[in-house]
Amino acid sequence: MYKQQSAIGKIIVIFLLILFTINGVVFATSDPVIDKDKTLDISAIDAFMTKEIDRLHIPGASLAIVKENQVEYLQGYGVSKPDGTKMTPQTPIVIGSVSKSFTALAIMQLVEQGKLHLDDTVSSILPTFQLANKEEAKKITILHLLNHTSGLSTYDGQLAISNGDQTLQEHVKTLATIKLASPVGSQYEYSNLNYNLLGAVIEEVTNTSYKEYVEEHIFKPLAMHNSYADPKDDRNNTSATGYQTVFGFKMPTKQLIHRGTVSSGYLLSSAEDMANYMIAQLNNGHFNGKNILSPNAMNKLHHPFAFIGDSTYYAMGWEVKNAIISHNGWTENTYSKVLLDKEYGISLQINAMDYFNLNEYDAIVNGLHQLVHQEQPSLSNSKPFLKYILFDLLLAIIIALIVRSIYRLFNRKKPKVTTFQLAFQWFSLAVFNLLLPSFVLIAFPQLFGPLSTVTLFAPGIGHLLFIIPVSLLIIGLITLVQYLLKKPIFASRLPGNN
């Protein structure tokens, strides 16, 4: 058993190192919408998308490309549902944190109307808003929330995702015990809580629901007919089914209810609608003869404010790097990204999420950006599925060894060992069955995030990242007791051991 413990420990170490290192053909399925004066190489774009979707085993995707104030290309790829329904530019998909740009836009509309000021404190608008440190909470302003400089933590924002089945106002009341991760205004730290609070601010100031405000003041003026703040409003059930990656296989899953986090990550929109949204963003708030925001306010919305790193800044619902404005978003089973430069806008939506290959999804948008500027895209030859084959193999071996170790806990046979072997057994027990699993369990939130969120976003592997160290620790504790008692605890329970 002790040799098995050593083997398990070594495999766990290898597994964790690999984990930290990794951070069927699908064709276009709808008739493309193309601007007659296009300069895009549509065949190259379709070939690139088809290759990437096939390589990454993506069920379906929708693409929108605009240039200045014109739609250049709309296309759907693959399927939107398990029954084979085709993905189209009109298919709504949950857009994740791209929702933050809509919330920021709504806030700036209220600022322009004089109903709100960026330096207003949150507590002056939301009477129920409190944190563990009440005095610090009173310092947080609307601008702090927009720029992610409130001091609220990434961890607490992640935790809120799995507890979203409540109204925005109810969600605000749950923050009373939360501690700030840093002093208000001192540094950037991305947190969904900031935009959940902004959603509640919109409701308080307008005396209407976030859903109703966004529909009336953003979706309608921009002719976004397949966009929703509540999935129940999709009465024709055209929204795409999301897929999660479970041990490397894409599985259709149903999202949790996210009423309390809709303003930070759970709006739905289609490629066609996102094209209109991008046109407004590229044209100082102007779309089809209407202004949803003044040029000055739109400039503030895009202005780099909080330094993130690597020449990247956070504005209001957008990241800014070298004059490129973008934001990605992912939920438990969808992905989206919008990228805007001074000329083009690109929106990619995918009805799947692969937490361990997220960078591959981001790279698709980067490749599309190169293509629209007549550049060769940076192509990846990696096979993400092979990573999962390795993961699955390692996990299978670890689980098999754990099962064998559990079985041997019931075996009281004690082979003779040398002093060196005994010392190694103690070392193996201490490191691989006590110290290492204890460290992983204690540091789990810092290493991976809240357990509820990890298991939600990375089912299967996320569960095992917790179950394996717990199992090792239990085996280690039982083995330690057996050492001290000098006899197997469970041996007498086995047939033939009486």
Segment roles from a protein language model:
Residues 73-75, 122, 130, 152-153:
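Juxtacatalytic substrate-recognition/specificity segment
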Residues 27-61, 65-67, 208, 256-498:
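Catalytic loop of the DD-peptidase/beta-lactamase superfamily, centered on the K-T-G motif
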Residues 70-71, 115, 249, 344:
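Residue-level signal for well-ordered, solvent-exposed loop/turn and beta-edge residues enriched
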Residues 44, 55-62, 83-144, 182-192, ...:
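Short active-site loop at a secondary-structure junction
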Residues 2-32, 68:
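Hydrophobic secretory-pathway targeting helix
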Residues 40, 44-51, 97, 102, ...:
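Extracytoplasmic/secreted proteins, especially bacterial periplasmic and envelope-associated proteins
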Residues 34-95, 131, 176-177, 234:
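Short, conserved catalytic-motif segment at the N-terminal edge
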Residues 81, 134-332:
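Short, surface-exposed loop or secondary-structure junction motifs
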